[in-house]
């Protein structure tokens, strides 16, 4: 157990791996244990126990908040923590714990849910977490999705301060009857504990068409005092309706004097991810691996345009002849099949062309063929049909802007021309094709960029709400990790769990 800053510094200096940090206010339970267990898979884990006075308004339960240090130490050790740190108020707030000195959480993120009912609470949260991160300097920060509003606000804090820490959200851990684990559950009497189960039950009973008043009525009928029931966008935390593909249905109630919060995620379809970018940015490689990691179907739309280009060349049709290309489309049978390991088989009229479409000859003509309105309309229609139920990640040139403008996550993956030429040369060599001079490859890529971005029909463009990711100097694993981090900021583990293994 660590108490002083000197002990913390000595612990930090002896680490051989990046530190993983689990901040708590004590009263540890299995939910905290799951955070520790998951964090321990990445490196040594430091658990802090600090009951933050700035998170409590006058009249709240600061004085009686559960304090059970010996039990906390035993649980942290059982789940694999390397150390438990119990800083003093003086350590965290050397100038005093006053609301006047607190950081301000983003106003837009605390207009609703708990932020509206507990003014100043999230200011206290961001203040203490910023200080804890300053003192611990971890590589990973592990937080529960149970406190979803807090998780969103802390992600924004880390982004605003440009802190070198990766935030990991972990799904809510529940009792057998659905009640979310919470340190405050121990306030409940046996009768209240049975009554509290109505909270998760009412949330589970709701779907995208259930009026909020119905959920409120169900909670009230169970004898719970309702503070709020709201449906919000999980990222902006602003109210939304049933048209939103993924929304957060959240509630706060009082069971006796105990305040309980919970939520459920409502989905009208499975997650949809759009990854766009210029040729040679590494989209196919990372998108395949990203899709496999998250259990999503991989849709390589570029392969579809390459397949049409291959057919055009096989039939001896001039790539620039739109009418002749359109005639080929009428009899086209283009099928994509996901393969084990994240690959994709491409079939054109019953023939496997998965390798043939990667030839330099196809690469040289695909922009011309893809620019035809008839081609884009035919393939876009097929792509939209494939993505209607979600559950896939698609990569191409205009996925986020034209094909799936309602995607949960849009990424514009790019790299410099020089870096893309280097990657293209390596790819050609690995596939057994002749490799041109680097300068020639760079010229081809620059010309391809020009053609893709200036065509009339669905040009290459970064969607206004897309995240730009420049991958120069990044390993494939680093790019995939960055994509997963962006995905999890929008789609929680609770809504779309990461597949085991």
Curated annotation (Swiss-Prot):
GO CC annotation: cytosol
SUPFAM superfamilies, sorted: Nucleotidylyl transferase, P-loop containing nucleoside triphosphate hydrolases
CDD domains, sorted: CMPK
EC number: 6.3.2.1, 2.7.4.25
Any one GO molecular function term: CMP kinase activity
Residues holding ATP: 25-32, 144-147, 173, 181-184
HAMAP family (alphabetical): Cytidyl_kinase_type1, PanC, PanCY
Name the UniProt record assigns to this protein: Bifunctional pantoate ligase/cytidylate kinase
UniProt source species: Parasynechococcus marenigrum (strain WH8102)
């Amino acid at each position: 157990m660590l108490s002083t800053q000197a002990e913390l510094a000595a612990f930090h200096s002896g680490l051989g791996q990046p530190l993983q940090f689990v901040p708590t206010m004590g009263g540890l339970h299995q939910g905290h244990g799951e955070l520790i267990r998951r964090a321990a898979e990445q490196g040594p884990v430091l658990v802090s126990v600090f009951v933050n006075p700035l998170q409590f308004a006058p009249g709240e339960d600061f004085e009686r908040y559960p304090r059970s240090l010996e039990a906390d130490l035993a649980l942290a050790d059982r789940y694999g923590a390397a150390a438990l740190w119990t800083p003093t108020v003086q350590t965290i707030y050397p100038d005093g714990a006053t609301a006047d000195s607190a950081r301000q959480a983003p106003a837009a993120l605390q207009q609703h849910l708990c932020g509206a009912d507990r003014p100043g609470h999230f200011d206290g949260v961001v203040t203490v977490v910023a200080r804890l991160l300053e003192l611990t300097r971890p590589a990973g920060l592990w937080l529960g999705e149970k406190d979803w509003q807090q998780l969103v606000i802390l992600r924004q804090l880390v982004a605003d301060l440009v802190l070198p820490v990766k935030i990991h959200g972990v799904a809510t851990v529940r009792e057998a009857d659905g009640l979310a684990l919470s340190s405050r559950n121990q306030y409940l009497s046996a009768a209240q504990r049975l009554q509290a189960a109505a909270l998760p039950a009412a949330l589970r009973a709701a779907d995208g068409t259930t009026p909020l008043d119905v959920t409120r009525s169900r909670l009230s009928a169970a004898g719970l005092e309702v503070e709020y029931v709201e449906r919000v966008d999980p990222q902006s935390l602003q109210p939304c309706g049933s048209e939103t593909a993924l929304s957060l249905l959240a509630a706060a109630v009082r069971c006796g004097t105990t305040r309980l919060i919970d939520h459920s995620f409502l989905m009208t379809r499975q997650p949809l991810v759009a990854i766009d970018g210029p040729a040679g940015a590494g989209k196919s490689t990372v998108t395949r691996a990203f899709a496999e990691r998250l259990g999503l179907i991989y849709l390589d739309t570029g392969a579809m345009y390459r397949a049409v280009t291959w057919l055009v060349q096989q039939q001896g049709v001039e790539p620039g002849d739109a009418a002749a290309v359109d005639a080929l489309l009428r009899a086209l049978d283009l099928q994509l099949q996901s393969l084990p390991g994240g690959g994709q088989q491409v079939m054109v009229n019953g023939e496997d062309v998965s390798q043939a479409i990667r030839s330099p000859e196809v690469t040289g003509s695909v922009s011309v063929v893809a620019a035809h309105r008839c081609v884009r309309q035919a393939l876009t229609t097929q792509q939209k049909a494939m993505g209607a139920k979600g559950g896939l990640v698609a990569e191409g040139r205009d996925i986020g802007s034209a094909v799936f403008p309602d995607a949960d996550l849009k990424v514009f993956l790019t790299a410099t021309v020089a870096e893309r030429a280097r990657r293209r040369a390596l790819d050609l060599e690995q596939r057994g094709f002749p490799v041109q001079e680097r300068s020639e490859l760079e010229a081809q890529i620059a010309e391809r960029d020009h053609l893709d971005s200036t065509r009339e029909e669905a040009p290459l463009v970064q969607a206004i709400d897309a995240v730009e990711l420049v991958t120069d100097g990044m390993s494939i694993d680093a790019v995939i990790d960055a994509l997963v981090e962006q995905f999890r900021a929008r789609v929680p583990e609770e809504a779309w769990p990461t597949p085991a293994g």
